[in-house]
Amino acid sequence: MADTSPRESKLNKQDQDLHLEIDETGLACKSEVKKRWLGARGTAGLYGNGKYYYEVTITSKGLCRVGWATLGGSLNIGKGLDSFGYGGTGMKSTHKKFDDYGLPFTLNDVIGCYLDLDSRTIWWSKNGEQFPAAFSIDVKYKNSNTCLFPAVLCQNSSLSVNFGSQPFKFPPGNQFTAVSDAPNENVNWWSYEEQNSFEHVVVKLPFAVEEDVHNEFRMHTKLMLTELKRTQCKQDKDGSIRRTLQPISKTICAFLNTDGGRLFLGVNDDKVIKGISMSKNMIYHFFGSLRHMCENFKPCSPLCRIKVSILEVIPVGVIKVKLRKADLLKEEAHDFPKLACHSVGGSFCDCFLEINKAPTKQYLLIIQVSPPNPNSRTTIFQNEEGLVYRRRMASNKCVYLDDLRRMMNEKNQVFVDLPDEARAEIDSFSKFD
């Protein structure tokens, strides 16, 4: 018999919308927010082969949607890509396409969620009555990198889940395996505690340059011209992170396409360290979005080249010591955390709603992009908006076709990785020297 994992499947508290409440067992959740969907994924993703099942019991009136989603899919299951949902209004949905399916459900109903990876189909049941196949899914969902996780969604409602730790109210039959009993070789486990790929560094930052600068921290400002090219500081006016992702994607893209660099979030243009107000949940939320953004670069940005550190800014008064950037970055930089996306781009992120509702501290975030390997062939990256950026002096410049040609000539290489759109235009150029 195949070995099964001793770990218990549950809802993932580090992969949820901010205001969804998950209980201590990880097997129940509720939302008291009206007219807003809040969701969460489970900790066990399923891939390869097999037939899997879990149950959801609706424990209060309101709207619910249940189903499956990849780590890269939207928590609003059924509206985004790579997610499949069945809702209380009696509709199935994926990628914003809603169709009548099954029956409506409400308080005390038990919904069975079926995933058949052998036939690549998804369907549901209500109180033991199975409905026809709802979706035929792509073969990519059999891959461990795009595997499907149980996912639930609430709007002013509550529910409980049973991944198999308790007897099912409506057993699915011998052919199906409970999610919690899936063989190890078919499970991609994820939770913050298990991966533990991100821990923030807490240090005191004694930055000061003048004794009359009271309770402000300042970075060493005597930067050489070459240092300016590889250094950028960003600070939102209100000290939040709600609009940080869109502009920093340009900087990360530019660093990837040149010689790397360091991006300081929470430092204004005058090099004064103001910090960013963040709660613990906001940290998870922000970095999940940041990772997802980088994975949507073309080609996918190599996360091995990107390191992230977070430092808590603790006021220590004004002192005469000047701490240089090089000293600061002796602190250990941690690998990119593996979290799923919540919000990407220039739109307001839900993170900022917590600023006045949860305990927050001031943090300095450092994103360090290492230089490319000089012995490898040149790769030109587009950010998630499909644009190519490169560092010029202390700013990011959108790169046009002439610049792309020059970038390749500078590297003196013919074989260059390019997105298909750029390659089609580059092909019209004469042969490079």
UniProtKB/Swiss-Prot annotation:
Cellular component annotations (GO), alphabetically ordered: cytoplasm; endoribonuclease complex; mitochondrion; nucleus
One Pfam assignment: SPRY
Residue ranges, annotated region (SLFN-like fold): 199-400
Assembly description: Component of the trimeric PUCH (precursor of 21U RNA 5'-end cleavage holoenzyme) complex; consisting of tofu-1, tofu-2 and either slfl-3 or slfl-4. Within the complex, interacts (via N-terminus) with tofu-1 (via N-terminus); the interaction stabilizes tofu-2 and may form a functional nuclease. Within the complex, interacts (via N-terminus) with slfl-3 (via N-terminus); the presence of tofu-1 is required for this interaction.
Entry function: Component of the trimeric PUCH (precursor of 21U RNA 5'-end cleavage holoenzyme) complex, that acts as an endoribonuclease processing the 5'-end of precursor Piwi-interacting RNAs (piRNAs). The PUCH complex consists of tofu-1, tofu-2 and either slfl-3 or slfl-4, with tofu-2 exhibiting endoribonuclease activity. PUCH-mediated processing strictly requires a 7-methyl-G cap (m7 G-cap) and an uracil at position three (U3). PUCH also exhibits a strict bias for piRNA precursors with an A or G at position 1.
PANTHER family: B30.2_SPRY DOMAIN-CONTAINING PROTEIN-RELATED, HETEROGENEOUS NUCLEAR RIBONUCLEOPROTEIN U FAMILY MEMBER
Protein name per its UniProtKB record: Schlafen-like protein 2
Native organism: Caenorhabditis elegans
